[in-house]
């Protein structure tokens, strides 16, 4: 077994690990917020954003997995209606995953940052309406993306040779469509997320200057909130940039028919919907407490320890308490 074969097998295993990890982390966010909704019959604004973001990312992860499977059997993938379903599902999941993450960045900015600008105070007062307006406005870009994708897909299908020998070109063409559409329609939301990140840094800088004037040595809750939000936002910006560049890598790899490079591109691409969701869990007090509770319960089960009914009820009550507790408002 040569070195390339070893790297290929290792990369394949890594893709499956990311696939499972991404489904578990996003599925946990969905389940946690669903239980919260069942208990309280309502969800806060940030919980709604996290819930829909996790659902869109689960779909995106499965789309990437379908693309990965097509490398081993291309002839069973890009055929007629299957191409349309996979392609347009990718467009939808990628669109909502990006815009929901952007609205999350805007949410953190307006809820945490301390600014005296009139426009900032106005947007902060109408935060819910702003988030809804951003998502409704994003539908205009989604419509334009779908219309352009339909025209490109019809043109592509019209001139396409359905023989198996051209399937590698089909995959390269499909990646090219996704890459350039993604580049065109992700500029605005990515810019908004970047601006939110920079403004939050500016707010943190002003806050730290204020703390120095009153000689506080320990980090106050506002500083901790700033740092937590910045970690979430910078991880999103970096991972989405890697996600975008991975499509470029995959496109170049398929042009040169390099399966190993294509798989490496997919590994990088899966990091965005998988790893960032884990960072969201660690940065959200409610989700973090619930996850620790579940891990503690799972560890006891795996060790084969005898859990009494009282102790089991105690764990269950604690989990319900964690779910019922709201995170950042």
From Swiss-Prot:
GO terms for biological process: detection of chemical stimulus involved in sensory perception of bitter taste. Its main location: membrane. Keywords: G-protein coupled receptor, Glycoprotein, Membrane, Receptor, Sensory transduction, Taste, Transducer, Transmembrane, Transmembrane helix. Coiled coil: none annotated. Putative taste receptor which may play a role in the perception of bitterness. Several bitter taste receptors are expressed in a single taste receptor cell. Belongs to the G-protein coupled receptor T2R family. This is Taste receptor type 2 member 102. It comes from Mus musculus (Mouse). The gene is Tas2r102.
């Amino acid at each position: 077994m040569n070195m390339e074969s070893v790297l290929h097998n290792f990369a394949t295993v890594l893709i499956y690990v990311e696939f499972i990890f991404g489904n578990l982390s996003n599925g946990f966010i969905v389940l946690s917020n669903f239980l919260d909704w069942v208990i309280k019959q309502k969800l806060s604004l940030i919980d709604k954003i996290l819930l829909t973001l996790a659902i869109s990312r689960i779909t995106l992860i499965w789309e990437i997995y379908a693309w990965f499977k097509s490398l081993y059997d291309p002839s069973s993938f890009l055929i007629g209606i299957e191409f349309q379903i996979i392609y347009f599902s990718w467009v939808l999941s990628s669109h909502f995953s990006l815009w929901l993450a952007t609205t999350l960045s805007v949410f953190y900015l307006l809820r945490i940052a301390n600014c005296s600008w009139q426009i900032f105070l106005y947007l902060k007062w109408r935060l819910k309406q702003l988030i809804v307006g951003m998502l409704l406005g994003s539908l205009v870009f989604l419509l334009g993306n779908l219309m352009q994708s339909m025209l490109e897909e019809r043109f592509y299908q019209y001139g396409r040779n359905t023989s198996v020998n051209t399937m590698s070109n089909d995959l390269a063409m499909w990646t090219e469509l996704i890459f350039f559409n993604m580049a065109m329609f992700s500029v605005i939301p990515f810019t908004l997320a970047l601006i939110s990140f920079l403004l939050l840094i500016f707010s943190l800088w002003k806050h730290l200057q204020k703390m120095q004037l009153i000689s506080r040595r320990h980090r106050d809750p506002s500083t901790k909130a700033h740092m937590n939000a910045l970690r979430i936002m910078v991880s999103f910006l970096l991972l989405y940039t890697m996600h975008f560049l991975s499509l470029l890598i995959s496109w170049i790899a398929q042009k040169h028919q390099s399966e190993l490079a294509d798989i490496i591109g997919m590994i990088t691409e899966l990091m965005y919907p998988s790893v960032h969701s884990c960072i969201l869990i660690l940065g959200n007090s409610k989700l973090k407490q619930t996850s620790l509770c579940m891990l503690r319960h799972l560890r006891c089960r795996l060790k084969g320890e005898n859990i009494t009914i009282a102790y089991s009820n105690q764990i269950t009550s604690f989990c319900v308490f964690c779910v019922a507790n709201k995170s950042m408002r």
